[in-house]
From Swiss-Prot:
This is Acylphosphatase. It is an enzyme of class 3 (hydrolase). It comes from Halorhodospira halophila (strain DSM 244 / SL1) (Ectothiorhodospira halophila (strain DSM 244 / SL1)). The keyword Mitochondrion does not apply. InterPro entries: Acylphosphatase, Acylphosphatase-like_dom, Acylphosphatase-like_dom_sf, Acylphosphatase_CS. Residues 7-92 form the Acylphosphatase-like domain.
Length: 92
């Protein structure tokens, strides 16, 4: 039996750098069993790659709209990703 994996890349804009957004995203991802990464982009956004069971990836995507308490999320744009699924969730 093969488990279906979803891979999604999201870019989050707003006040999302310098507010522990990446670390909080990693905590949520690990809790949900999602692998991938969260990294700052030069333009002030954060990019998240989420790989895992579709329901877990959907929960993480939903959480990205709120983020940690210090963040102010203005928009979240997600699209399917073709990246290989990482073994863990990292912050870069």
């Amino acid at each position: 039996m093969t488990t279906t994996q979803e891979k999604t890349r999201c870019t989050i804009s707003g006040r999302v750098q310098g507010v522990c957004f990446r670390a909080a995203t990693q905590e949520q991802a690990v809790r949900l069993g999602v692998t991938g990464y969260a990294r700052n982009l030069r333009d002030g956004r954060v990019e998240v790659l989420a790989c895992g069971p579709p329901e877990a990836v959907a929960q993480l995507r939903e959480w990205l709209h709120e983020g940690p308490p210090a963040a102010t999320v203005e928009s979240v744009a997600c699209e399917p990703a073709d990246d290989p699924a990482p073994a863990e969730f990292s912050v870069g």
